Amino acid sequence: MGEESLKEFLQKKTNSKQELCKKLSFEHGTPLIGLVIDNEVEDSHRSAVERFLEGTCSLEVEVVAVADTDLDSFSHPNVHYVPYSEKSRKNIMEASDIMVALPSNDMEEMLMNGVIPISHKHELINNYNPNSETGNGFVYGNANEVDHWKMFAALIRALETYKFPYDWRNIISTGLTSTHK
């Protein structure tokens, strides 16, 4: 992807984020974390997500969860719920800075939408290395062992990197190009 097309892509992403934040009535100045929770989410993963979301309350982030499952157990001031539909899924993919990837989620779709995944080990995701400035996501462990502490640690790494626009842009670019191989 050329420099101009990357600029255009990032501008569209910024506009999508602003529109979603306006629609859900919160500021767009903080990192936006997306989460797609579907019926395929195992109970152990659901429990890890609940604990993970509790931890996000102490961070300056907004979380938008698109879900087709019962969400009565989730209640946090910085977490916004949207009923699952193809349109809401598309909107969250286009708007999110970061997405928490569960084993049932589509990694390629995240990368193609310029989303930085917080992901279990996956063939499409290379753990970001700040020293060599390589990678396209932040890895938290194996798909069969979803641990909320490891997810949270990967999120903190991502949020620290988010503060550096040049590095963040490079991770997005790496993710976009990794889907075209």
Question: PLM features: residue spans?
Answer:
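Catalytic cores of carbohydrate-active enzymes across secretory and cytosolic contexts
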Residues: 1-181
